[in-house]
Amino acid sequence: MAYGVVHLPFYATGFRGDDLEAALSKLAPISLRYGAIRYDVFRSRDDRYKFVLQVEFAEKSQWDAFYFGEEFTEMRAACSSWFAVPLLYWWNDNVARGELRRDEELVDELA
């Protein structure tokens, strides 16, 4: 089965990068309640206002339920001045994936 991965870029408004990071870090785990298999929140090292929320689902309908669900809708309303609009996501088929296990000490530091 080819899973789908949603990429949703955010661009924080002036001086709101840390606030947006906290909001996305709080929101992302909620995707698991909607059937997500994995989520990641990325913050650019080159441009600290640039973020990407990446969430993997088996079905696009699960993403739709999460995106239009109560928690995500409330986050968008409460934080609407913290990021540039519109929010435009794209749905991707995951056609290949590889991963090396991280050193356990490093994983603990990142958690």
Over which residues does each language-model region extend?
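Short S/T/G/P-rich N-terminal loop/turn motif that feeds into the first structured element of a domain
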Residues: 1-51, 58-70, 85-111
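Outer-membrane beta-barrel domain signature
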Residues: 72-81
